[in-house]
Amino acid sequence: MSNADRSEDRAAIAARQWRSERPDLDSFPMEAVGRLLELAQLIVRDRLNPVFVRFGLQNGEFDVLATLRRSGPPYALTPTALYEATMISSGGMTARIDRLEKAGHVRRVKHPTDRRGTLVALSDEGKSLIDDALSIHVQTERTILAALSDDEQKTLDRLLAKLLARVEGE
């Protein structure tokens, strides 16, 4: 199914089959959402994960480092803030922080105002790593979107934001 000039993608084939088997069923929603799901899986698996692997990271670890980096100096957040910003489970977050700490990309430090708390801080090595990885990551995303004109990209972004707001609000 990697042929770029194929006339039908998997979602179109499934929708055509449903129209044949269940003509009473509106298959358009399955077709559109199916394309979104397949596209997301392909982007992560075939385009983004190879970037993460190149830098010795997993997807969730990249997210943690990127979240710390975009938080600005001193590039440190509580584990709870990281959990909320990345939508990773608290147990999953602990495992990621442990791996990143072991690799030297982050360190746990005492919270400056809460004696009971800790912060997860980006190390100099982690900052350098995420800066390098981000450059390749953004270029990869730019390449993906290059299939669309600038106006199409803006329209896609607006429509996806609208759908996301709707689904999050339900």
Describe each PLM feature range.
Residues 1-55:
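N-terminal leader segment of winged-helix/HTH proteins
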Residues 27, 37, 41-89:
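N-terminal helix-turn-helix DNA-binding core of bacterial DNA-binding proteins
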Residues 96-158:
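Charged, amphipathic alpha-helical coiled-coil/dimerization segments
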